[in-house]
Amino acid sequence: MAGSRVARILIGLAGIMGADGVILAAASAHGADAARLGSASSMLLFHACAAIGTVALIERGVIHVRIGMVAAWGFVIAAALFATDLTLRQYAGHSLFPMAAPTGGTLLIASWLALAVAAAWPRQVS
């Protein structure tokens, strides 16, 4: 999987998540009653790092490839869902869809558990 397109896409998305996390942190620091943005920022920043780390572990052959990819994509998709919902609530006054943030949070938990399984599962033989 070394240098695969999917890995590069995940890393690129994680970079965008990181940038968005910093933007939301700044908005939270300078905006009135913007606590939701701080939570959105944290989720994006933490899980951008988690996605990059997971890809690195896959590339090194430390964790199961397929399960690790599920975890990495889960980090990206779920953190984006969570942060988008909180940001919409802050600026637009409504949610992305009912239970969007809790759904994103639940998917983040599942992604962390998938990473644990990927680490425990034997490496695939090439």
Task: Identify the function of each model-found stretch.
Residues 1-126:
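Polytopic transmembrane helical bundles with strong interfacial aromatic enrichment
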